[in-house]
């Protein structure tokens, strides 16, 4: 923004300190070969409309999520190439994984109606390489597949299940006379600790961290959870494929996020979010030994999300990214700020 440049605020200081070219929309975009739009989905239509007025012929417009194209039906000038590089995690985790010399699994795609010079895929590959995505795996997808699988993963195992399970497991621990601080810490850091095993050996390694008797119990619990949630997961998938889920979300945007803000308020005031600090150390194995239900929920949620996506026609690699592989990175956000960052 011009005002930020004139006042030389913190963003300006950070950018100039790291030798970035600083300028406003009108001065930078007309000369840019690649313009990346990383604004929130609900702002895309207005942002993209303004970008197109300034972008030069044969430039590239980049997305990290294709909601605006697929669900809003946004049309882009035919002389602009439209690509997507979608890391499968929150933006904060993309940066953290890059800083430690790695990256996150990434989907890339070219919008079929906007590949003006047939160079879209090469540009997308280069962009994914620059974020370190190639170190974790880059999969060519499509705008439609990325959006539908992303929404399904978020609404089920990645966000929906983790959030609900955090609240339910906390209440369960309290009813069994556990200290509120201990219960809060076990759940807040338990998801991160337990899902770390998924990175290295999938569900098999996660289950192997349990004793034989606990493993049997977790397996039986997971089967029961899958039976209970199967129809709900299928309904989520049907609503996402049909566009019903997105239309309701867009309507809430128009209502100034009334539903979203109400849900955030309710979550903020739950017992889990308000749980006190606990300064005693919980050993790594203790998270598994006292988190059998959490392990069962993870196993059931991952398998059910994956299976439901496959049944709807989403390819296995994409379903895997959106069910198992992204899960540890989402769990990290709970470890940082409980459910605040996720929401």
From Swiss-Prot:
One Gene Ontology cellular component annotation?
A: cytosol
Cofactor or coenzyme needed = Mg(2+)
Show the coiled coil region(s): none
The record, for SUPFAM superfamilies, names: 6-phosphogluconate dehydrogenase C-terminal domain-like, NAD(P)-binding Rossmann-fold domains
Q: Report a single Gene Ontology molecular function.
A: NADP binding
Question: What does it catalyze?
Answer: (2R)-2,3-dihydroxy-3-methylbutanoate + NADP(+) = (2S)-2-acetolactate + NADPH + H(+); (2R,3R)-2,3-dihydroxy-3-methylpentanoate + NADP(+) = (S)-2-ethyl-2-hydroxy-3-oxobutanoate + NADPH + H(+)
Residues binding Mg(2+) 2: 150, 322, 326
Q: Name one Pfam family in it.
A: KARI_C
Q: Which residues form the active site?
A: 65
Q: What is its EC number?
A: 1.1.1.86
Give the protein's recorded name. Answer: Ketol-acid reductoisomerase (NADP(+))
UniProt gene name: ilvC
């Amino acid at each position: 923004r011009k005002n930020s440049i004139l006042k030389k605020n913190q963003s300006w200081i950070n950018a100039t300190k790291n030798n970035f070219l600083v300028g406003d929309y009108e001065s930078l975009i007309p000369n840019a070969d690649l313009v990346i739009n990383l604004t929130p989905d609900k702002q895309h239509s207005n942002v993209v409309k303004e970008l197109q007025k300034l972008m030069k012929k044969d430039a590239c417009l980049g997305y990290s999520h294709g909601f605006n194209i697929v669900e809003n039906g946004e049309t882009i000038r035919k002389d602009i190439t439209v690509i997507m590089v979608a890391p499968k995690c929150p933006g904060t985790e993309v940066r953290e994984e890059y800083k430690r010399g790695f990256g996150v699994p990434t989907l890339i795609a070219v919008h079929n109606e906007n590949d003006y010079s047939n160079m879209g895929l090469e540009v997308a590959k280069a962009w994914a390489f620059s974020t370190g995505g190639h170190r974790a795996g880059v999969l060519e997808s499509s705008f439609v597949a990325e959006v539908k699988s992303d929404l399904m993963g978020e609404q089920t195992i990645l966000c929906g299940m983790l959030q609900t399970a955090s609240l339910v497991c906390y209440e369960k621990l309290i009813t069994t006379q556990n200290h509120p601080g201990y219960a809060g810490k076990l759940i807040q850091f338990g998801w991160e600790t337990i899902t770390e095993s998924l990175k290295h050996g999938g569900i098999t390694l996660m289950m192997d961290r349990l004793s034989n008797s606990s493993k049997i119990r977790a397996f039986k619990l997971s089967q029961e959870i899958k039976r209970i949630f199967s129809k709900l997961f299928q309904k989520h998938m049907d609503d996402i494929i049909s566009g019903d889920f997105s239309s309701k979300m867009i309507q809430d945007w128009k209502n100034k996020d009334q539903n979203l803000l109400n849900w955030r308020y309710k979550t903020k005031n739950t017992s889990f979010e308000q749980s006190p600090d606990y300064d005693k150390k919980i050993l790594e194995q203790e998270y598994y030994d006292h988190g059998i239900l959490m392990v069962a929920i993870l196993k059931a949620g991952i398998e059910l999300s994956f299976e439901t996506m496959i049944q709807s026609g989403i390819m296995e690699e994409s379903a895997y990214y959106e069910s198992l592989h992204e899960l540890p990175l989402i769990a990290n956000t709970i470890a940082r700020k409980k459910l605040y960052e996720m929401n």
